């Protein structure tokens, strides 16, 4: 069981936590502030409104047309290829920063990674996934 000592330290069996009072206070306050603000907003909000609350709000104007518009699949293909190469950049940046310290094995691993992505790009290009027409 935990007990407080006279020198403001919390003792859990063998472990003594000394000087963590500020951290405990910070955690307590940072937990209470969002809980209290959400509770206050729930208590002070206006009552529920009628059917106009369920309508779509679009820049203060009545919405024109339906919300479900079909996009051409080409947009998705370009977005998918972009995301793949964007993730490649995210993975290669730390490798490039630490290139001098990593050695030959890391170079070979990065080369294999880039080769797999280039093969995927060639496959998408050959299948016509990058053609706009």
Swiss-Prot record:
Pfam families: Oxidored_q4 (PF00507). GO terms for biological process: photosynthesis, light reaction. It is an enzyme of class 7 (translocase). Its main location: membrane. NDH-1 can be composed of about 15 different subunits; different subcomplexes with different compositions have been identified which probably have different functions. It comes from the Bacteria. It is found in: Cellular thylakoid membrane. Its EC number is 7.1.1.-. The chain crosses the membrane at residues 12-32, 77-97, 102-122. This is NAD(P)H-quinone oxidoreductase subunit 3. GO terms for cellular component: NADH dehydrogenase complex; plasma membrane-derived thylakoid membrane. GO terms for molecular function: NADH dehydrogenase (ubiquinone) activity; quinone binding. Keywords: Membrane, NAD, NADP, Plastoquinone, Quinone, Thylakoid, Translocase, Transmembrane, Transmembrane helix, Transport. Belongs to the complex I subunit 3 family. It catalyses: a plastoquinone + NADH + (n+1) H(+)(in) = a plastoquinol + NAD(+) + n H(+)(out); a plastoquinone + NADPH + (n+1) H(+)(in) = a plastoquinol + NADP(+) + n H(+)(out). InterPro entries: NAD(P)H_OxRDtase_bac/plastid, NADH_UbQ/plastoQ_OxRdtase_su3, NDAH_ubi_oxred_su3_sf. NDH-1 shuttles electrons from an unknown electron donor, via FMN and iron-sulfur (Fe-S) centers, to quinones in the respiratory and/or the photosynthetic chain. The immediate electron acceptor for the enzyme in this species is believed to be plastoquinone. Couples the redox reaction to proton translocation, and thus conserves the redox energy in a proton gradient. Cyanobacterial NDH-1 also plays a role in inorganic carbon-concentration. It is a multi-pass membrane protein. Signal peptide: none annotated.
């Amino acid at each position: 069981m935990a007990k407080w000592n006279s020198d403001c330290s919390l003792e859990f069996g063998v472990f003594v936590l000394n000087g963590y009072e500020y951290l405990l206070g910070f955690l307590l306050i940072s937990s209470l502030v969002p809980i209290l603000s959400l509770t206050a907003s729930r208590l002070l909000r206006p009552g529920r409104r009628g059917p106009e609350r369920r309508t779509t709000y679009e820049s203060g104007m009545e919405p024109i047309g339906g919300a479900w518009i079909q996009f051409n699949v080409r947009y998705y293909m370009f977005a998918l290829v972009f995301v793949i190469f964007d993730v490649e950049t995210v993975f290669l940046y730390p490798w490039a920063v630490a290139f001098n310290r990593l050695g030959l094995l890391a170079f070979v691993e990065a080369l294999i990674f880039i080769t797999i992505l280039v093969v995927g790009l060639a496959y998408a290009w050959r299948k016509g996934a990058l053609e706009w027409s």
